[in-house]
């Protein structure tokens, strides 16, 4: 039915079809009936249809990791925001932090940091105007690093079909101004707010 051939039983398939065709859908059922499995299949299908970017959330880190793992197994480009130490070890490569570490702009940032360190080391020997110019260069470099880091974050998020986060994490400032035509909340009954 979805990318990666996620197999659904008839009731799961009906739930997925409802979720894809209605503005709001609640899927409920006892534990172990495949609600998360259905959520993953739905997200994969929506991603395949290009209906993103999609925000997928859950109250707990474990539940978010389950969504992320299912999405990655179906070939969806998903990224996990949040603290990497809270993410299952096998999924860390899909975290925003891990993808930023491997980003091509890191080389440019390293050069600027080296240059800034060099200026810092020279500061005690400088006086007057030279010292003022050195401080200006340090501030300029810090600003450039922040700009590059923000560009990296935006490029990773823009490349993702699905952004996964805890409910609390979905309020992070890095998502400010970002519009999600589709939001899926797994285990919504556990949400505190």
For the regions a language model picked out, list residue spans one by one.
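Walker A (P-loop) phosphate-binding loop of P-loop NTPases
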Residues: 32
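Conserved P-loop NTPase motor core of helicases/translocases
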Residues: 1, 44, 50-57, 63-183
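Active-site-adjacent beta-strand anchor residues
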Residues: 9, 57-58
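Walker B catalytic acidic pair
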Residues: 187-188
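Short hydrophobic/aromatic beta-strand immediately N-terminal to the Walker A/P-loop
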Residues: 25-26, 55
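N-terminal pre-P-loop "Q-motif" helix
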Residues: 5-23, 38, 165
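Motif I (Walker A/P-loop) of helicase-class P-loop NTPases
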Residues: 36-44
């Amino acid at each position: 039915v979805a990318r990666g051939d996620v197999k659904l039983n008839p009731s799961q398939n009906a739930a997925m079809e409802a979720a894809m065709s209605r503005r709001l859908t609640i899927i409920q059922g006892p534990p172990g009936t495949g609600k998360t499995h259905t959520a993953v299949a739905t997200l994969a299908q929506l991603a395949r249809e290009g209906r993103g970017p999609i925000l997928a959330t859950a109250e707990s880190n474990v539940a978010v990791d389950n969504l992320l793992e299912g999405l990655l197994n179906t070939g969806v480009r998903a990224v996990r925001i949040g603290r990497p130490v809270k993410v299952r070890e096998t999924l860390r490569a899909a975290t925003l932090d891990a993808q930023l570490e491997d980003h091509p702009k890191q080389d440019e940032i390293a050069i600027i940091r080296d240059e800034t360190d060099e200026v810092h080391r020279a500061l005690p020997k400088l006086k007057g105007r030279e010292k003022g110019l050195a401080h200006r260069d340090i501030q300029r470099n810090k600003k450039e690093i922040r700009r590059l880091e923000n560009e990296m974050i935006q490029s990773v998020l823009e490349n993702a079909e699905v952004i996964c986060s805890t409910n609390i994490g979905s309020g992070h400032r890095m998502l400010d101004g970002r519009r999600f035509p589709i939001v899926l909340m797994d285990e919504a009954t556990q949400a505190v707010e």
